[in-house]
Amino acid sequence: MENPLYNDWSLLLEDEFKKDYYLRLRSFLKKEYTEEKIHPAMEDIFNALHFTPFHKVKVVILGQDPYHGPDQAHGLSFSVQPGITIPPSLKNIFKELTHEFGMSMPTHGHLTHWAKQGVLLLNNVLTVREGKAHSHRGQGWEVFTDKVIQTLNQKDHPVVFLLWGGAAQKKGELIDTNKHIILKAPHPSPLSAYRGFFESNHFSKANQILHKNNVEEIDWTLPESPSQG
């Protein structure tokens, strides 16, 4: 089985691509990408791992599954492609950032600037059918992303996990909290953001934890143009 990764994640996860569950997932995806409209594009599926190598991971933001609208998803949780309207949950994330740092509201939702600094923007499920939320649940991605979380437990310096909502917090059961830090809040969706996501101060708290551990903090502001990210 060909390993689709090309940085330090490649060696760490290479055994996963030989396992039965992944071979079944791969067969399922080949059929889906042939017969249906699937997001993100096949070459973008592993962008979270490609943009944020293992050795650079400082913060993890767990999402559920990719956006299922046209041209939104590009392999990073909560992020959208340049030129795409900022979705409601991401808009609420930006509102929280403006509250915490007094920054102006970003004009785009392309989060590669965060990913390149060490923020792993990982979804629980990495693909979805257009217009059908959660349509690729239970096909094997959850096993793969569990392995990503378990692999992060090996890191020497503390990683800060931002877990928003019940699904992400369930994944948190895999995290070694003797070494790493979990910050929990409701999901930033308009349905739940007012129940404690707003004013959670997760972004500034994450930076405080990094600073305390002599790790460079994240610049949560976004460049004016996505191409500068």
UniProtKB/Swiss-Prot annotation:
Keywords: Cytoplasm, DNA damage, DNA repair, Hydrolase. It is found in: Cytoplasm. InterPro entries: UDG_fam1, Ura-DNA_Glyclase_AS, Uracil-DNA_glycosylase-like, Uracil-DNA_glycosylase-like_sf. The active site is at 65 (proton acceptor). Its EC number is 3.2.2.27. The keyword Hydrolase applies. It catalyses: Hydrolyzes single-stranded DNA or mismatched double-stranded DNA and polynucleotides, releasing free uracil. Pfam families: UDG. GO terms for cellular component: cytoplasm. It comes from the Bacteria. HAMAP family: UDG. Excises uracil residues from the DNA which can arise as a result of misincorporation of dUMP residues by DNA polymerase or due to deamination of cytosine. Belongs to the uracil-DNA glycosylase (UDG) superfamily. UNG family. This is Uracil-DNA glycosylase.
